[in-house]
Amino acid sequence: MEDSTSPKVTLYTYFRSSCSARLRIALNLKSIPYTPIAVNLLKGEQSSPENIALNPSGTVPTLIVEHDSKEPVTITQSLAALEYLEEITPASSHALLPPASNPEARAVVRTLVDIMSCDVQPVTNLRILKRVAPFGVDRAAWSKDLIEDGFRAYEAIAAKSAGLFSVGDSITMADVCLLPAVWGAERAGVKVEKFPTIYRVAQRLEEEDAVKRAHWRTQPDTPEEFRVSSS
């Protein structure tokens, strides 16, 4: 986006939210400045009247894009926000999808995105873990098993499609969704190195400045005991 037409972007986020991290990474890759507003999930701030008014799902992230000549755009689902950012940014920005001339590669990217965002994240997020706890479910084992199931599927596809990253040699939407899932997997005790393509791609992604600035350990709301410098 050109500076003269750049909208004001606000991201309601939580430092450890994988869905929020997707947008932090994407915004950084596309060099889109944004203002982060922290929503503390552990304190239940996502269920506050103020957050519900912005995000009826009572979740994060919420992306608000304010254009000079248009009504503000509010997007409350991370994948919809990623697609929106892809559509409003020029070709000269970092594209998160392969070119339209390669629909096959775009389909692979979207398949990998769906594995992380539909198969893994919804059943391992904090809200679901709280719901299953009264049934005596081992939350750690639940998360670990379901993450590993998703990683096996991702690995099988990415092993064929990967170059430097999950699909070819450019960072795509698949990688933007993969790395936050890897952070969550490590927290759940998954040995990510069991999935060699995922592990290799994640290691390379961690070297990117856009990723370092989006990392859960470098956010304004990251507690001091977890904080590291993004430099």
Swiss-Prot record:
Positions of the GST C-terminal domain: 102-224
Domain GST N-terminal: 7-93
UniProt GO MF annotations: glutathione transferase activity; maleylacetoacetate isomerase activity
GO BP: glutathione metabolic process; L-phenylalanine catabolic process
EC class: isomerase
Keywords: Isomerase
Keyword Isomerase on entry: yes
Recorded catalytic activity of this chain's protein: 4-maleylacetoacetate = 4-fumarylacetoacetate
One Pfam family hit: GST_N_2
EC number: 5.2.1.2
GO cellular component: mitochondrion
Keyword hit for Isomerase: yes
Pathway entry: Amino-acid degradation; L-phenylalanine degradation; acetoacetate and fumarate from L-phenylalanine: step 5/6
Stored SUPFAM superfamilies: GST C-terminal domain-like, Thioredoxin-like
Induction behaviour: Expression is positively regulated by the cluster-specific transcription factor hmgR.
Role: Maleylacetoacetate isomerase; part of the L-tyrosine degradation gene cluster that mediates the biosynthesis of the brownish pigment pyomelanin as an alternative melanin. The 4-hydroxyphenylpyruvate dioxygenase hppD catalyzes the conversion of 4-hydroxyphenylpyruvate to homogentisic acid (HGA). The protein hmgX is crucial for this conversion and thus, probably functions as an accessory factor to mediate specific activity of hppD. The homogentisate 1,2-dioxygenase hmgA is then involved in the cleavage of the aromatic ring of HGA and its conversion to 4-maleylacetoacetate.
Family the entry assigns: Belongs to the GST superfamily. Zeta family.
Protein name from the UniProt record: Maleylacetoacetate isomerase maiA
Origin species: Aspergillus fumigatus (strain ATCC MYA-4609 / CBS 101355 / FGSC A1100 / Af293) (Neosartorya fumigata)
Lineage: Eukaryota, Fungi, Dikarya, Ascomycota, Pezizomycotina
